Amino acid sequence: MSQETIFALASGAGRAAIAVIRISGPATRNTVTHLCGTLPPQRKSSLRRLRNRSGEILDQGIILWFAGPGSFTGEDCAELHLHGGNAVIEGMADALVDLGLRPAEAGEFTRRAFLNGKLDLTEAEAVADLIDAETSAQRRQALQQLDGGLSRQLETWTATLTRVLAWQETLIDFPDEDLPAEVDAALRTDLLLLRQEMAQALNEGAKAEKLREGLIFTILGKPNAGKSSLLNSLASRDAAIVSSQPGTTRDTIEVRLVLAGVPVTLIDTAGLRDSADSIEAEGVRRALARAESADLVLRTVDISTATEADFSAEQWPGSSEARSLMIGTKSDLPYTPPSSPDIVLVSTLTGDGMERLKTMLEAEARALTSHATGAPLTRARHRAALQDAIQHLEDAESARLEELRAEEIRLARQAVGRVTGQIGVEQILDHVFSSFCIGK
């Protein structure tokens, strides 16, 4: 355990009705005694006058303290529930520093919980995800991980690898023993099934990460194709300037939406055309770049002036394999009906077709983020470790020597252990916990 005692404002910054200051470390008990005059009963809320070292009353608030290891961090902890004025908060912070405490760094409380075995690394990350959750779907995913769902899956894989490795070591240590002939075949089958299960989890993990980070939908099309009007209609506000003059949009414009419980960044882009104007040309370049990295491209065409060629995927820049929706705008004007039934016809002026488009966008959001029941891998580092484990299992299956196979199985087990923080993670701890807010 750390010898330093830390504190931080755990509630939101700024003027509020209530402010919560969290304390953790070996000096917590003495600190609470100094502030209150006597030590309140643990795990019970107590209304006390709080004084600094000079005896000046700083506030009257509710005190909670928890003796370690039965606390969030595994250390002695306390919470001070104070009035939320800045003068009260600053006065209490000064008093705590005067008592020898120091302000906590970002994520330091959760880091101590991890180091003291109260959370594994995936559960610690879930705390950050829960704080950052914008939608109910993100909240459910974070709670599932915080509840240990991913940890239990990883423990199951680790147990399988440990069992297989034990049999493999037996084959090496006792080559002359009359072991059942089926043992080697059974080990190979176990490794194959485990690798397939991990590969499926890897695929679902990409979708879970998209849910955690949010999707990007990019609107693409020629000048005056109705892109900005479409953005404004979907956003239900005037986020982009709409004009009959071509080239009005020079840079990307982003709005944040929630579709089917999934956060989506909708991006309006410059109209696609060759231009001698360097600023407009840069806007076109950025439009193509955002479309290239998008999860879904909304290809917009002015239906009132369109030809069949305008709806051909080959006529659009970028990969023809990109996930996209073809949208015919300005359907309130006279037009020739397109031959493809997959083209969504809309009018942002009358609203015709907009509900159908929103329904289709929600379906796309669900398809891009839905995964099977279970605990998915939600971060790039999770998937990188699992990719390493899968590679080691593939190498184990093709190894000609029993010793090499055992080593690859051992390395696969270590890769799985990196996800929960059991093995070789010192170099990533700072990165993980630096993303937390102060007081968490």
Curated annotation (Swiss-Prot):
Its cofactor is K(+). GO terms for molecular function: GTP binding; GTPase activity; metal ion binding. Residues 214-366 form the TrmE-type G domain. GTP binds at residues 224-229, 243-249, 268-271. Its EC number is 3.6.-.-. Exhibits a very high intrinsic GTPase hydrolysis rate. Involved in the addition of a carboxymethylaminomethyl (cmnm) group at the wobble position (U34) of certain tRNAs, forming tRNA-cmnm(5)s(2)U34. The keyword Acyltransferase does not apply. It is found in: Cytoplasm. One of its GO terms (biological process) is tRNA wobble uridine modification. This is tRNA modification GTPase MnmE.
